[in-house]
Amino acid sequence: MTTELRRKLVIVGDGACGKTCLLIVFSKGTFPEVYVPTVFENYVADVEVDGRHIELALWDTAGQEDYDRLRPLSYPDSHVVLICFSVDAPESLDNVQEKWISEVLHFCSNLPILLVGCKVDLRNDPKTIEELSKTSQKPITFEEGQVVAQKIGAYKYLECSAKLNEGVNEVFETAARASMLKFKPASVPKTKKKKHCILL
């Protein structure tokens, strides 16, 4: 009989980008219709990956700036980190590079990171497209998400819709698989020291 593995997953990203809905749909199977900002919340869910049973402790966090000093308390003893953004909010993808990746690398430097595009059901939503066009913006494309994932050295880029329950299980199966790896951040962006060549 195989022993059950326990893994801790932390999810971060801008406020209202879809983190909590993603966790609730995966762990409870229901989509919460009312938005209530999270401070800290924990869920537990089981996942079967490659014949192994894994208990995932899911740590939800607040994306709002008010909680920037509290959020780091969620990071210790984690095995994998999800950085989320919403495809209907281009600034949430900008913040992946401008805020979230530096915070995650500071507190979880050797962990696998998954970049997750949430709310993909809104990508082709006429109302969303119209609203974004007022500020000369468009919903984030799959390719744009993938480019950012490569830039931040993510283990993988995935997309999902918690509302339609599409791609949700794949996100957590991939995260569980990543959490079992001995991870070395080979492609994490680092500031390179300039080397000077001296010609003799």
From Swiss-Prot:
Q: What is its main location?
A: membrane
User: Binding residues for GTP, per the UniProt record?
Assistant: 13-20, 60-64, 118-121
Subcellular location as annotated: Cell membrane
Record key words, sorted: Cell membrane, GTP-binding, Lipoprotein, Membrane, Methylation, Nucleotide-binding, Prenylation
- GO cellular component assignments: cell division site; cell tip; cytosol; nucleus; plasma membrane; plasma membrane of cell tip
Which Gene3D superfamilies does the UniProt entry name for this protein?
P-loop containing nucleotide triphosphate hydrolases (3.40.50.300)
Q: Which chain positions have S-geranylgeranyl cysteine-type lipid attachment? A: 197
> Which residues are reported to carry the modification Cysteine methyl ester?
197
UniProt cross-references to Pfam families, sorted A to Z: Ras
Determine if Cell membrane is one of this entry's keywords.
yes
| A Gene Ontology biological process term | regulation of endocytosis
Bilayer disposition of the protein? Lipid-anchor
The entry sums up its family as follows: Belongs to the small GTPase superfamily. Rho family.
**What protein name is recorded for this chain?**
GTP-binding protein rho5
